[in-house]
Amino acid sequence: MLIPFLFKLTLPLASGIALSSCGTLPEADLGTAAGNQTSSEPTNSVEIVQANQPEIKAVPVIDGLEHPWGMAWLPNGDILITERPGRLRIVRDGVLDPEAIAGVVAVSTVSAQQLFASQQGGLLDIALHPRFAENRFVYFTYSHGTQQANRTRVARAVFDGEKLTDWQVIFEVGQTKPGGQHFGSRLTWLPDETLLVSIGDGGNPPVELEGDFIRQQAQNRASHLGKIIRINDDGTVPADNPFRNDPKAAPEVWSYGHRNIQGLAYDPVTQKVWATEHGSRGGDELNLIQKGKNYGWPVVSFSKEYSTDQPVAPATSRPDMVDPLQIWTPAIAPSGLTIYNGDRHPEWQGTIFAGGLVDRGIRHLRLDENNQIIDETTISIGQRVRDVRQGPDGHVYVLTDQNNGQLLRLES
């Protein structure tokens, strides 16, 4: 029997560097802690007092998911959910179908032609085409290749309600990399039916590419690594991409200088794009994404090296690079992001819900008209939070990244 959880709300900083209660190993995405770490940066903490804060509870919808990663709602209210090991599941009328949806690319850790499901890699995000009712297109991100040479891919397929057909790769990262780290892989649509895709920087030291640590590719505009890319629904390059006509840049690049974005959301009310990004041993970020901008990694960062605990970068800010709006040290390992615009919870209108793997909860942030954070609370889930999304019914839904992962619904 699934029992509703009651969530504890803690009240950290109104602005500046938010302090959570956990640290990370090199793979914060895997959710193992390496002891608490404290920030060396100054903070201006203030106590936030919230009157009449409604109690928030998580109502379990289903369990029995193996490391779920992303979710998307069909027009009839059914939910498609990806599982990182390589399966696509469906929830029909609130019940998880015991059989996986057929038609997903096959899984292998040795064949370069199949889905690579190891460490952080596997079947990752999912998004329906904005005109799904007409074309039945479903989009996926996944890792492809082998332990020695792999990359992020974007594919689309046709879903007829029972199975996938016509699996077609429409984009792949131009360089292969070794290891199983930092695939990025969040998807979000813009109103013009172009698709934003986050691509990770490829991994932590000692992983190298082209004679240097692979993370340096985040500053190389000719590389897809460490970027947000923007493509048309068929994988072609939009005419107004910022570097389309730059011979020294990959034409798909939309923004760069990212480490590993696993929270990406478009706010239709403000027409802004938001992202949450994993740091290294702290320095997790919330960013407002702008076309063509440089977000600094690894040239500027609040992160520290896993091996030495020394700063990754010589500076935390530069005038030619975009500063984050929020920094979390110790790390929360952010994954999953939504900006609430539903009618069911008017008190949440315009607020941000950012999931955390190591944090085992959700950061709930309120902003002023200048996009400055004026309030942040922690909703403690007690499980690794992989994805957070607003459903068509106006509820906020949560996927927990566990062997027996759950789909939860937030209510107040």
Curated annotation (Swiss-Prot):
One cellular component (GO) term of this entry: outer membrane-bounded periplasmic space
PANTHER family: ALDOSE SUGAR DEHYDROGENASE YLII, HEDGEHOG-INTERACTING PROTEIN
The protein's name: Uncharacterized protein slr1608
Any one Pfam family match given in the protein's UniProt record, by short name: GSDH
UniProt keywords, alphabetically: Oxidoreductase, PQQ
Signal peptide: none
Domain of life: Bacteria
Cofactor(s) needed for function: pyrroloquinoline quinone
Family: Belongs to the PQQ oxidoreductase GdhB family.
UniProt-recorded Gene Ontology molecular function terms: oxidoreductase activity
